[in-house]
Amino acid sequence: NKGGVGKTATVQSLASGIVRLNHNLRVLVIDLDPQCNLSSLFGVRDNEYDNIYNAMCKQSGVPVYKCKNGVYAVPGSAQMENIEQHLPGGPSLREQMKSYTVLLGCLQDNDCHDMTGEGLKNVFDDFDYIFIDCPPALSKNTYNALVAASKILIPVQMEALSVKGVSEVLSVMDEVKEFHMNDNLELLGLLPVMVDERTKITKQLSKLLGEKHGDLILPCRIRRSVKFLEAQAHGQSIFEYAPYSSTGIDYEIAIKRMFNIKI
């Protein structure tokens, strides 16, 4: 839940990597972050009307675009910063919980706002994988994502605030399950990202993360590399820019282990 932990880059890399490994799989990304960095990376930013904000406010089908690398995307909006005032809700817990189910309702809508010309109707039925990029701060946007999701992946950068934030995210996940907002929600695991194994602080924080959440850490990590930073600067995924860099290799290994992708 901390900005800069590599969550957006991880969503981009996982989605692009899955399509690269198996072109028959259909992958959708949804941008809930008001910063709209994911939308920028996939070239669907600045859609003033056809975005997730308007879909959630109107509680209608979501607009789906097809990007150049074969991934599909639902654009975000800077207005997501203020969406809480437009969601249903009230003082009671039951009324509050109603505001957490808006995204799920949009995704279940059989009148998907298809911008691809492919006849899309229902997001859940039309895609094999759906990735939701959440905002850095815990908010109703986060709850909406967790209520709609089947699994949660927590990217963890080897920085003190990122490691500390893991417990907060796990607490929110437990709350969603405790109040039966999504009984099927599962933790996919913690994914160490932007790892520089040469530094002392990385070794110290890796040890701390292992002591606190050792059984939750995935058996893979994503190393930091210059090629990855260059790819981001060029608005490309690591698989488009440098698939055989250390970061590209790490993401491919992570994808195969997490999703059991058949090539």
Indicate where each model-derived feature is located.
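P-loop NTP-binding core
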Residues: 1-263
